[in-house]
C-alpha cells in the first residue's frame, strides 16, 4: 500500500511517497501550481499516482499554533476534495505545524544548503515529514 504525502501551497505542491509497506517516506518532487489561475498540477499528480501505484493520499493541514484553522487549511481541504473526486482515492489529513520549519532546519544544519538550494527542495521535504509523521502515528490510511 503506497501512499503519497502532499504539502499544498498556493504556488507549489511538495510530493512524497511511502515505501510499499508504509514504513518510510521519501520526497519525490515539487509540482508547480498557480492557485490564483486555477492551475493545480492534477495532470502531473495523476502521472505520479499511476506510476507509483498509489492507494491513498495524505495532505498536510497547516493549522495555526493554537490549533485553529485558517484560510490555508481550507485551501488544503479543497485540494484534497479535488484530488479525491478526480482520482477516486481515499484522502486523509495530517497536522503539518512546524514541518516547514523542521525541513528548513534540516537543510541548514544537516545538509548545509544555501538559501537558493533550500528553496528548491523545502516543499518536497516538508511533504516527506508530513507523510512520515502520518505513518509513525497511524501506519495506514484511516480516512476514506
From Swiss-Prot:
Keywords: Cytoplasm, Hydrolase, Nuclease, Ribosome biogenesis. SUPFAM superfamilies: Ribonuclease H-like. Transmembrane segments: none annotated. Gene3D superfamilies: YqgF/RNase H-like domain. One of its GO terms (cellular component) is cytosol. GO terms for molecular function: nuclease activity. InterPro entries: RNaseH-like_sf, YqgF, YqgF/RNaseH-like_dom, YqgF/RNaseH-like_dom_sf. It is an enzyme of class 3 (hydrolase). It is found in: Cytoplasm. Pfam families: RuvX (PF03652). CDD domains: YqgF (cd16964). The keyword Nuclease applies. Belongs to the YqgF nuclease family. Could be a nuclease involved in processing of the 5'-end of pre-16S rRNA. This is Putative pre-16S rRNA nuclease. It comes from Oenococcus oeni (strain ATCC BAA-331 / PSU-1).
Amino acid at each position: 500500500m503506497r501512499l503519497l504525502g502532499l504539502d499544498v501551497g498556493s504556488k507549489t505542491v511538495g510530493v512524497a511517497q511511502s515505501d510499499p509497506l508504509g514504513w518510510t517516506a521519501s520526497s519525490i518532487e515539487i509540482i508547480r501550481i498557480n492557485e490564483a489561475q486555477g492551475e493545480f498540477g492534477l495532470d502531473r499528480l495523476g502521472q505520479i499516482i499511476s506510476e507509483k501505484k498509489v492507494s491513498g493520499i495524505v495532505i498536510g493541514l497547516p493549522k495555526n499554533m493554537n490549533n485553529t484553522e485558517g484560510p490555508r487549511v481550507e485551501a488544503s481541504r479543497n485540494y484534497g476534495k479535488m484530488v479525491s473526486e478526480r482520482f477516486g482515492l481515499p484522502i486523509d489529513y495530517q497536522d503539518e505545524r512546524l514541518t516547514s520549519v523542521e525541513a528548513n532546519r534540516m537543510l541548514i544544519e544537516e545538509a548545509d544548503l544555501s538559501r537558493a538550494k533550500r528553496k528548491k527542495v523545502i516543499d518536497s521535504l516538508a511533504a516527506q515529514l508530513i507523510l512520515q509523521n502520518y505513518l509513525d502515528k497511524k501506519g495506514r490510511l484511516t480516512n476514506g
